[in-house]
Amino acid sequence: MKEGFVRIVLLLFYVSFGMSAVGQSNNGNYRLASQSVSTDKTVHFADLSQEPDDLRQELDADAIALSKIPSDPILKPDPFGIFLDPFEKLTDQINKSAHLKIGETYTFVSQYATITPDGVRHAQTSGRADFTGALKVYDHGSTAGALSLLVRSGTNIGISQQFNLSDSLGSALTLNCLQGGGPQEPIMVNILYWREDLLHKRLSLYLGKIHPNEYISLSMFNNDERAQFLNGSSDGNLTFASDGAYAGGAAVEYQATSHVYIHALTIDTEGSPQGNLKTLADRKYMESVEAGWFSGTPGKQFRDYRMNFWRDDTESLGSGVGGGIGFEHELRSGWTPFGRLGFASNRGTSIKQVEELGIDQVKPFGRRGDMFGISLSHSEPASGAKHHESVLETFYRLRLTKSVDLGPDLELSNHPTYASRAYTSALLGMRMRIIF
């Protein structure tokens, strides 16, 4: 009965938002596309400085717009500048090179769960370093080639590196995407690929270790766990067995018109963030294609409506098919409703249906550097799980200085999927990101 009520509420909100919707600071011109970790995010760069016309890749255009949004910190000058300015100056010196761009962040998160299973600790504090780099190998105007790299390192502070609060609660929705599922990993090469641009950069090909969330179901407002929502259902379409993965594969982005884009990918379903490409030989792949329509740019009434389909072969879950739809619609006031709906067969994935609906405010109190968000997600597991799980999350991100943002986060986890008994727990959180 409760599950039916949640579905009805989500459906009504989805329809009402959808009907109303129809009708940080980096002055470069390099793409920074948010991504996810075992479901984030990460950052990816690609040079667009010699783009010959206005027909740009949708994700590249979004990244340029995001880079122009001012950080708008509360504290000026930066009181932490004495410690962080040397790193910033070093990064700036490197980034002045016409061929190399780098970026570094470190994100802390502390969570306390009010209710846990017997014998499970209530609190976890952890940190994650993200290092990104992009090397422009050549640019001939109509064609270009570049290498992109993402390295991450996660650490639990004061407790065992094996502990994962989300896993211990029995959640299938990944309540802390900064860690993802499983233990902390000290060093992971999450992304390492070659990008080849063709047709005056309307067509881009990617080959190497990739992240499917970068191409399928990516949201500019509902994706980056370092600065937006922490839970996994806000990181992509969780009915994808490969959602949040980092593995060997290939992807294509094609900008068909100034408003229509097509993305497609193939990825190894046995790959992992800490693994290499050797499992490609097992021939267990996921293939997916997404088509979407967008207008505007983030911060200027951005709208994006998309649909996608996928199929996969996995080692432990068998083969399956599925699809999904998603949207975000930024209003002039800064309020931005968004939603996702994913569906799948009983095989090939651990979650066969997920619904999410929420709203962001991208300039709360007129502050462009801050962000507020709230979302509600509900999932229906495939066979073998115990409960339908729902997560309500809300956060506020305050840009304290040009180098630091922080803010509270609250998650209500209702009936974790793999818990032995049904229960509800509130996760009280605080997050801080340092931008070098």
Q: Could you tell me what each predicted segment is?
A:
Residues 161-193, 200-290:
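Surface-exposed coil loops of outer-membrane beta-barrel proteins
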Residues 243-244, 275-283, 313-319, 343-354, ...:
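Solvent-exposed loop/turn segments connecting transmembrane beta-strands
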